[in-house]
């Protein structure tokens, strides 16, 4: 997981790996463990993200904001991005605003 895509260490300790292109998204999907969250934009192309080592709701929201930030923008659509997060049989759906760059720069690894 550490060698694929963009990496972020989220404030509550979660490790987020996010694909930069389709090949990395596919590789991340192969690396998903049973305790990992998979996070994707629900209505547009964008990165696949894998959140590991955290069940904190705040880390999940920050991960969703990062997915929204790096997802393809809709010119006529709202700024909020519908996001789906899955962990095993559990699915959570919500909307996320893209995180501003200055908010997450210190999280990059």
Stretches with model-predicted labels:
Residues 1-50, 55-57, 67-75:
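Nucleotide-activated chemistry modules centered on ATP-dependent adenylation/adenylyltransferase
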